[in-house]
Amino acid sequence: MKKLFFSFVFMLLPLMAMAQQSVPAFKFGYFSYDKVLHAMADYATATRSYNDLKAKYDAETKRSVEDFNSRYEDFLDVQRKLEPSILRKRQAELEELMDRNIAFRKESERLLKKAEEDIYAPVHAKLNNAVRQMGKESGYAFILNADNNSVPFVNTAMGEDVTEALIAALK
């Protein structure tokens, strides 16, 4: 039994040695997501679109604040001359206007956040698809996002910076 076992092990040794020699080289890529994203023409277009929308909301917010301020100043000018019932009515109107302004501001922030996600989603999808495609074509095991000091060390013998290649591919 021992002879059979040892002969089997000796037959497997050359196979195991060949298997270790044929291990493919492990390689990966890394890039700066922000640098590539900001270099994309689609990102500039999306940013302009978002900024236009934000400017419209900001203008409406400014208009409503100015309207409230002018009404409040008018109220302060005539406050001492008003009857108590009219005074309470005007105060209630101002409070309601202020509450509506606060509600509008919160709603506009929510809508702007959603619009930002919707506007930039196709840009992020395009970049992610390009990264995926480059990884497949170049045979990378994975591609890392090196922003925010998330990858403090990269061995350049094993990893390759694909930032410029991605920028070129997305133009």
What are these regions (language model features)?
Residues 20-171:
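Amphipathic, charged alpha-helical segments and their helix-to-coil junctions
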Residues 1-23:
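Bacterial Sec-dependent N-terminal signal peptides
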